Amino acid sequence: MFKHLRRWFVTHIFGRSRQRARLVSKDGRCNIEFGNVDAQSRFIFFVDIWTTVLDLKWRYKMTVFITAFLGSWFLFGLLWYVVAYVHKDLPEFYPPDNRTPCVENINGMTSAFLFSLETQVTIGYGFRFVTEQCATAIFLLIFQSILGVIINSFMCGAILAKISRPKKRAKTITFSKNAVISKRGGKLCLLIRVANLRKSLLIGSHIYGKLLKTTITPEGETIILDQTNINFVVDAGNENLFFISPLTIYHIIDHNSPFFHMAAETLSQQDFELVVFLDGTVESTSATCQVRTSYIPEEVLWGYRFVPIVSKTKEGKYRVDFHNFGKTVEVETPHCAMCLYNEKDARARMKRGYDNPNFVLSEVDETDDTQM
């Protein structure tokens, strides 16, 4: 009980006073800001206009969508008004009744805007139409029709592409809020639970991690966000996961693990961020998606394990209880990985009949000594 109170006190009192900076948020967004980018580098974003439009937020995308259509309608409406003005088809020029205008029934800027709208959207009410009197009007009609198709294709395609991006599929992949450290298969492991909320599978799923921390090289150079590979496995391996039910992935804390020299008492004092990646191909669209999350030391629970959430019903179906998805229970766990391996070495030496590996008993033939 006192252990729970101490962990709650440290998390809610001291955790609020010193918020750790995260590179990746819990929902996978990258917390990074680019500064002092020159104008030439910013121009590259306009060269790759398709990716720039796709990456825009919805409010900016809809603003661009509405502005593109209204702007093109107004611009061509102004051009149609200029054509009528130059050809003196407007009522203020008092054209004769037997004169054929470039565009019938354009009486001002409002009617020119309506004709531009009807032309580009292909409404075609029939009251305003182009005659064969002006080659300029015919060319402008062709140009607006082609440009209207391009704008429609680009803007509608951008919205459809943003809706169908696999990024939205990644929202249905969830990770446990906390990672736990406990024994599994006689080894000390760091465990994380991940679940697929859809019945459609991720094909060729691969999971891995990166440990980010500040390190100092022997030459005295400080490397911020130094990355160390963290290998995660499940009981069937880490390639081509059968992601039909929630999985508990684990990282074995051995001599090659960066967690090997950490202990339960010093874990909260560490300064690192564990970023976990899950790559896979969406079964329904064949698009590749990536899911990310991160864990800081306060979110790693030493001496806990996840409670079971998969059970079998009377009808023979397997039921997943997501109410207990992130719940943990306390279990007996060594307070450091080094202690566990030292204990195993001590037991192995005891089985061989000696405690000190440098001291080995050897038999002496006493008959040879007496004969001498």
Curated annotation (Swiss-Prot):
The chain crosses the membrane at residues 59-83, 137-158. The keyword Ion transport applies. Disulfide bonds: none annotated. A motif (Selectivity filter) lies at residues 122-127. It is a multi-pass membrane protein. The modification Phosphoserine is found at residue 25. One of its GO terms (biological process) is regulation of monoatomic ion transmembrane transport. It comes from the Eukaryota. Residues 109-120, 121-127 dip into the membrane without crossing it. Interacts with SGK1 and SLC9A3R2/NHERF2. This is ATP-sensitive inward rectifier potassium channel 1. It comes from Mus musculus. The gene is Kcnj1.
